[in-house]
């Protein structure tokens, strides 16, 4: 799940601003 890998998720997803 992207929630476990915020760095793999798109910018501004979970804590990735």
Swiss-Prot record:
Tissues where this protein is expressed: Midgut and brain.
GO CC field: extracellular region
Keyword hit for Secreted: yes
Keywords: Amidation, Cleavage on pair of basic residues, Neuropeptide, Secreted
Highest taxon in the source lineage: Eukaryota
GO biological process, one term: neuropeptide signaling pathway
Arginine amide sites (modified residues): 17
Subcellular locations according to the entry: Secreted
Keyword Secreted: yes
Job of this protein: Myoactive peptide. Increases the amplitude and frequency of spontaneous contractions and tonus of hindgut muscle.
Protein name: Tachykinin-related peptide 2
UniProt source species: Rhyparobia maderae (Madeira cockroach)
Source organism phylogeny: Eukaryota, Metazoa, Ecdysozoa, Arthropoda, Hexapoda
């Amino acid at each position: 799940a992207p929630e476990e890998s915020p760095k793999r998720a798109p910018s501004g997803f979970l804590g990735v601003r």
